[in-house]
């Protein structure tokens, strides 16, 4: 009989651990692995098409590009080539696919030291507007009017 599958927690990572604990965790990671970037990748709360990842925390080389990281996430979700998804930084920014993780860390790291990314399918947004708000609001703040 196979072992039971681990079901990802429903609560976001930031709500599961205090700021101090997260900062301590990042400090330990960065001290031990100075060339790695601590990244938390979570499914958009209203996502229904894409599967949950088996883990949320990733330690990635700083020279890795977003294209390469996207490929890693895609393979962990076991998506077909025709299945597309967005990977948003801080729940609101689509970043350049040629950007390195070091650049993303420099520009988008949270106060706790993690970089937070959210993935969602195009179907989740359900409208023709750009997925990334240009006004600085997060996706939850934007109404999406049906056609």
Curated annotation (Swiss-Prot):
It is a lipid-anchor. The precursor molecule is cleaved by ATG4 (ATG4A, ATG4B, ATG4C or ATG4D) to expose the glycine at the C-terminus and form the cytosolic form, LC3-I. The processed form is then activated by APG7L/ATG7, transferred to ATG3 and conjugated to phosphatidylethanolamine (PE) phospholipid to form the membrane-bound form, LC3-II. During non-canonical autophagy, the processed form is conjugated to phosphatidylserine (PS) phospholipid. ATG4 proteins also mediate the delipidation of PE-conjugated forms. It holds the Pfam family ATG8. GO terms for molecular function: phosphatidylethanolamine binding; ubiquitin protein ligase binding. Changing residue 126 to A: No processing of precursor. It comes from the Eukaryota. It is found in: Cytoplasmic vesicle, Autophagosome membrane; Endomembrane system; Cytoplasm, Cytoskeleton. Most abundant in placenta, lung and ovary. A lipid is attached at residue 126 (Phosphatidylserine amidated glycine). The record marks 126-127 as: Cleavage. GO terms for biological process: aggrephagy; autophagosome assembly; autophagosome maturation; cellular response to nitrogen starvation; cellular response to starvation; macroautophagy; mitophagy; protein exit from endoplasmic reticulum. The modification Phosphoserine is found at residues 93, 96. Keywords: Autophagy, Cytoplasm, Cytoplasmic vesicle, Cytoskeleton, Lipoprotein, Membrane, Microtubule, Phosphoprotein, Ubl conjugation pathway. Its main location: membrane. A lipid is attached at residue 126 (Phosphatidylethanolamine amidated glycine). Residues 127-147 form a propeptide. CDD domains: Ubl_ATG8_MAP1LC3C. GO terms for cellular component: autophagosome; autophagosome membrane; cytoplasmic ribonucleoprotein granule; cytoplasmic vesicle; cytosol; endomembrane system; microtubule; organelle membrane. 3 different light chains, LC1 (a cleavage product of MAP1B), LC2 (a cleavage product of MAP1A) and LC3 (produced by one of the MAP1LC3 genes), can associate with the MAP1A or MAP1B heavy chains. Interacts with TP53INP1 and TP53INP2. Interacts with CALCOCO2. Interacts with TECPR2. Interacts with TBC1D5. Found in a complex with UBQLN1 and UBQLN2. Interacts with UBQLN4 (via STI1 1 and 2 domains). Interacts with UBQLN1 in the presence of UBQLN4. Interacts with TRIM5. Interacts with ATG13. Interacts with MEFV and TRIM21. Ubiquitin-like modifier that plays a crucial role in antibacterial autophagy (xenophagy) through the selective binding of CALCOCO2. Recruits all ATG8 family members to infecting bacteria such as S.typhimurium. May also play a role in aggrephagy, the macroautophagic degradation of ubiquitinated and aggregated proteins. Belongs to the ATG8 family. This is Microtubule-associated protein 1 light chain 3 gamma. It comes from Homo sapiens (Human). The lineage of its organism: Eukaryota, Metazoa, Chordata, Craniata, Vertebrata.
